[in-house]
Amino acid sequence: LLLGVLLALVSVTLTRGVFEAPVFQDTNHRGRAIAVGVGVLVPVVGLVAAGLLTITDRIRHVQTGVGDRAIVVLTVAGFALLGLLDDVAGKGAPADKGFRGHLRALVSGRLTTGAVKLIGGGALAVVVVGALQPGWTDLLVDAAVVALAANTANLLDRAPGRCGKVTLVAFAVLWAATRADTRLAGVALVVGAAIGLLPGDLDERFMLGDAGANAYGAALGLGVVMTCGLAARVGVLVVLVALNVVSEFVSFSRGIDATPPLRWFDRLGRRGAD
């Protein structure tokens, strides 16, 4: 976790010039022009951290957790790249947002970058879960958990720091529920990166974009798949399906603002928050 935090802080500093390029510029919720897609650093941090830990483990003649870390960081890399595509090439009309928007575009003969992200994310989830789970039931449930977790994180990424905070809380719950299962080591690297990127996100120095939200959600979904029993995974899937369906009709931001405890937590640490 700490390694992820440190590497994220270093990577943000070293790549500041990269994200000043026009292709990464977008407007945030205040209408300010800032860098978007900085969340693509999450898989970079994860890969570097996993590489360093693998070398350390080899020196210590320890092999535990190497495969779990590799699966998580490579999956996160795939989801982040799909999100980055939407960040830099999908600055289209609001009508194309959400499942219904992408479906309308597809019916009219247009394949949006958001649709590419959803289809690609679903396929990636099937491939990854297929390597972990042998049965059909496990495959369908777990692939849906990973893909919908990534999309749910995207739905939450509508205000500075919101997605990062929810990621930290969700990981803490998962960590406690699984009694600090060692298979969460790879997910912990991603969460460490989330901690390192949170201050800049809250201060509106940059936006994570779909690249970051996708990465966070996919990592958490994969963490559930790797550590929880079938009943728990089905329960998580039901919640994720419900959130995705509700999002088509209700604004999460409005719901959060209308609920004092959630509003306080959502605005905690944010620039200009009441």
Give residue ranges: language-model regions.
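Short, highly charged, low-complexity non-transmembrane loops/tails of multi-pass membrane proteins
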Residues: 254-274
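"…together with the soluble PPM/PP2C metallo-phosphatase catalytic core" -> "…together
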Residues: 1-254
